[in-house]
């Protein structure tokens, strides 16, 4: 098993210790952080493959931490919080989180979701197939984990990169929300369109800042595909 480094950001020492124990039992290396400010320091000094994040933190909040990280980093961020209302979940996904686990959590589910995120992240950052995908003036580099539109760099999250990779691998195929969720998130689709819609919306907005071209087309009543060239 590859060795992955995970930053666990949780101000409750008992919960932080439990999460580290769960993850270390799965073979991961964990660094505990107990505030948003401390987490920023660790994230700037060292490389982490994934961040497990509480929202209600002293000082810098979880939401502020996500915003700060997404200015320059793309690793998966899983939010784990008691703030589990629909508005809260949609908000953190829009900010750039890749997944959300409500508290109280199930130990096995935490480990499974971490494994799924890292598996997908590893696949798109170094997976098979052509290293560079292009669609018009849109370019995606698997090895460099970069996206450019009209020659301009586009900063995307791990999940957004994964979605775009899948769409660009099959530019003629229309993907339903269920197909996108099951292939990108690696879990069973439960009929909630918000997760997929939010990530598609965020991805489109970022691409639009670099170029006015429409890259991702909505096929009404079905799903999404790459736009026709």
Per-segment meaning from a language model:
Residues 1-125:
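N-terminal/domain-start alpha-helical segments
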Residues 4-5, 116-174, 178:
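Short, Lys/Arg-enriched segments at the junction into DNA-binding effector domains
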Residues 41, 182, 205:
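Alpha-helical residues within the helix-turn-helix
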Residues 44, 173, 189:
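Flexible coil/turn residues that form the inter-helical turn or adjacent wing/linker of helix-turn-helix
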Residues 67, 131, 152-154, 182, ...:
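Pre-signature/interface helix of ABC/ABC-like ATPase nucleotide-binding domains
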Residues 106-119, 155-165, 177, 190-209, ...:
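DNA-recognition element of transcription regulators
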Residues 183-188:
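Short helix-coil junctions and helix-kink-helix linkers
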Residues 226-228:
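Short, cationic-aromatic polyanion-contact patches
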């Amino acid at each position: 098993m590859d060795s992955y480094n995970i930053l666990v950001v949780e101000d409750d020492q008992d919960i932080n210790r439990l999460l580290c124990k769960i993850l270390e039992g799965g073979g991961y290396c964990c660094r505990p952080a107990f505030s948003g400010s401390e987490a920023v320091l660790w994230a700037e000094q060292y490389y982490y493959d994934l961040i497990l994040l509480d929202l209600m933190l002293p000082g810098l909040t979880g939401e502020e931490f996500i915003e700060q990280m997404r200015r320059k980093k793309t690793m998966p961020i899983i939010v784990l919080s008691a703030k589990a209302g629909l508005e809260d979940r949609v908000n953190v996904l829009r900010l750039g989180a890749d997944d959300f686990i409500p508290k109280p959590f199930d130990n096995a589910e935490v480990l499974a979701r971490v494994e799924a995120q890292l598996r997908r992240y590893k696949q798109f950052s170094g997976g098979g197939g052509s290293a560079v995908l292009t669609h018009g003036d849109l370019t995606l580099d698997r090895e460099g984990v970069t996206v450019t539109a009209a020659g301009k760099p586009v900063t995307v999250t791990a999940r957004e990169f994964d979605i775009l990779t899948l769409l660009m691998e099959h530019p003629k195929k229309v993907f339903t929300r269920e197909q996108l969720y099951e292939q990108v998130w690696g879990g069973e689709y439960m009929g909630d369109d918000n997760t997929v819609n939010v990530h598609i919306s965020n991805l489109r907005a970022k691409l639009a800042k670099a170029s006015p071209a429409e890259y991702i087309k909505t096929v009404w009543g079905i799903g999404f595909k790459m736009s026709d060239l």
